[in-house]
């Protein structure tokens, strides 16, 4: 028998063996009694591709099958055959993950290949993408020649989106935005998303404009950069101290240092372009956050002052370690001209002094190159009359029924007791209690980092009991919550109050609501009715005439 014929016979026998093997697997997996033409075509294609088992089916093979069928049948019918390909693969995964070995084999993990979301091991995710599986954002090519670290970071963000966003337009926007951002990172040779620079993010916005014509859709997609930076920072085992943006939820900061009603969520070092200056600022912030005890809001205020200083000298390509008294004098005199109050300017001087003192202790400079006391300005305490006129707050009370319930309750705490808005926002379900016929409230003072108790009107106590029961607020829950169940934002409260004051035409629409004014109003009323300043300090912790 000729050798060529012998080879043909052997190949034919091998093909028939593969067909039988695959037919048995498909029949078992899909629980078929009879194979129709769609299954037969699939089996024959797999056999021709020398596929031995269904486990070898993947997205690359799917694309080949699509091309193969396009040459045999009408284009509109190809999708029918692709659905069968997907069903077989998905059913195989679904049944295999029921076993320990199968879970290990089919687990959705990062691989240097093309990943197809409909082949995810989580069946809930598979079902959620059934109607959108032909979109480009379902296909993720991790076999391209690019930074391995960047590709793994993109995969982590992809997983976060799939696991944390329900099937919706928002998830589609996140997936599409990430898909475009991944392409951008590949083309711009981004090595590490954690080290993304401001100029690169701005470049991405230009890249996005070329990709997406619709401005509204562009605006929805552009936020993906922030999400990618946040997730990649949070999911690393060790804190990335070299990252250009730090996200504070990564740090185990004692709650006494945090203000839940006005949280500092991130710290950006991107503005400081000089590498050495940025590194020193990162070292300083590592100390302030990790070892320091100041409230994070105070730390952040100092940070911004130092960052502005370093940004200016970095733009001049000057190292902070080479700054002399003359250069600092130039900078501080500029700030002196810009500052509205002596207190503001003195804070700037002190913050820069502390930073140089840190550099001195760490051995980066021999000594602080300027004397802060030379620049300090005398602070003259001025009483700012910020009291709300009676006709104003009475008009609000008369129209309070037009405000949402949570705003009504929060406003009453300002008007009745004179609390700080940060204290109102962080009240918890166990704040109110009755003792010996009197009504009290337990408050955590963010500013003082301590608890205090104050007497409250019986009417407010009764109203809050109804509110707590109606909204099923547990003892440890925040009474006024944001969408995620955390403390209500004080900035959101102020914005909403301004909106409803305008809508209710308070003072003919000219009244500008300021929450802290009500604290001054309560203090002034107490003083006018004979309560001494010392009495107000002890009882309400309110200093007359001070912010």
Describe the predicted segments one by one:
Residues 363, 414-435:
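Short, charged phosphate-coordinating catalytic segments
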Residues 1-358, 412:
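Charge-rich, intrinsically disordered N-terminal extensions
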Residues 494-538:
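Short, basic (Lys/Arg/His-rich) helix/loop patches that form interaction surfaces
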Residues 427-462:
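Conserved tyrosine-mediated DNA breakage-rejoining catalytic core shared by Y-recombinases
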Residues 457-510:
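Active-site/catalytic core of tyrosine-dependent DNA strand-transfer enzymes
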């Amino acid at each position: 028998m000729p050798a060529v014929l012998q080879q043909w016979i052997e190949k034919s026998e091998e093909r028939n063996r593969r067909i039988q093997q695959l037919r048995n697997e498909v029949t078992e997996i899909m629980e078929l009694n009879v194979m129709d033409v769609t299954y037969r075509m699939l089996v024959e294609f797999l056999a021709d591709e020398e596929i031995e088992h269904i486990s070898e089916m993947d997205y690359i093979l799917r694309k080949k099958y699509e091309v193969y069928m396009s040459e045999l049948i009408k284009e509109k019918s190809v999708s029918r055959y692709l659905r069968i390909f997907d069903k077989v693969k998905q059913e195989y995964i679904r049944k295999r993950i029921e076993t320990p070995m199968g879970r290990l084999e089919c687990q959705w993990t990062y691989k240097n290949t093309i990943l197809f979301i409909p082949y995810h091991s989580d069946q809930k995710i598979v079902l959620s993408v059934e109607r959108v599986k032909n979109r480009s954002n379902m296909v993720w090519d991790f076999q391209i020649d690019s930074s391995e670290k960047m590709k793994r970071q993109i995969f982590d963000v992809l997983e976060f989106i799939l696991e944390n966003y329900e099937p919706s337009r928002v998830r589609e926007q996140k997936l599409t935005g990430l898909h475009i951002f991944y392409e951008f990172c590949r083309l711009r040779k981004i090595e590490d998303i954690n080290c993304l620079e401001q100029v690169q993010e701005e470049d991405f916005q230009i890249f996005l404009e070329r990709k997406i014509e619709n401005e509204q859709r562009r605006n929805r997609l552009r936020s993906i950069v922030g999400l990618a930076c946040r997730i990649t920072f949070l999911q690393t085992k060790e804190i990335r101290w070299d990252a250009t943006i730090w996200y504070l939820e990564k740090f185990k900061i004692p709650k006494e240092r945090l203000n839940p009603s006005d949280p500092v969520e991130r710290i950006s070092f991107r503005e400081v372009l000089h590498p050495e200056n940025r590194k020193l600022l990162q070292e300083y912030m590592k100390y302030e956050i990790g070892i320091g005890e100041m409230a994070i809001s105070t730390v952040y205020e100092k940070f911004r002052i130092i960052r502005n200083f370093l940004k200016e000298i970095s733009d001049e390509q000057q190292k902070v370690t080479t700054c002399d008294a003359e250069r600092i004098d130039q900078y501080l005199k500029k700030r002196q001209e810009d500052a509205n109050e002596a207190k503001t300017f003195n804070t700037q001087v002190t913050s820069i002094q502390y930073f140089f003192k840190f550099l001195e202790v760490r051995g980066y400079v021999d000594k602080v190159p300027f004397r802060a006391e030379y620049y300090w300005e005398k602070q003259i305490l001025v009483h700012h009359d910020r009291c709300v006129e009676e006709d104003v707050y009475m008009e609000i009370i008369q129209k309070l029924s037009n405000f949402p319930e949570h705003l009504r309750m929060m406003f009453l705490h300002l008007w009745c007791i004179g609390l700080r808005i940060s204290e109102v926002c962080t009240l918890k379900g166990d704040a109110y209690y009755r003792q010996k016929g009197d009504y009290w409230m337990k408050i955590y003072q963010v500013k003082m980092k301590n608890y205090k108790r104050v007497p409250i009107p019986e009417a407010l106590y009764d109203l809050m009991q109804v509110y707590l029961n109606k909204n099923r607020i547990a003892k440890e829950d925040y009474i006024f919550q944001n969408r995620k169940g955390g403390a209500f934002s004080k900035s959101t409260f102020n914005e909403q109050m301004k909106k409803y004051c305008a809508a209710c035409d308070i003072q003919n629409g000219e009244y500008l609501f300021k929450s802290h004014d009500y604290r001054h109003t309560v203090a002034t009323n107490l003083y006018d009715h004979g309560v001494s300043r010392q009495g107000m300090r002890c009882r309400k912790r309110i200093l007359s005439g001070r912010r």
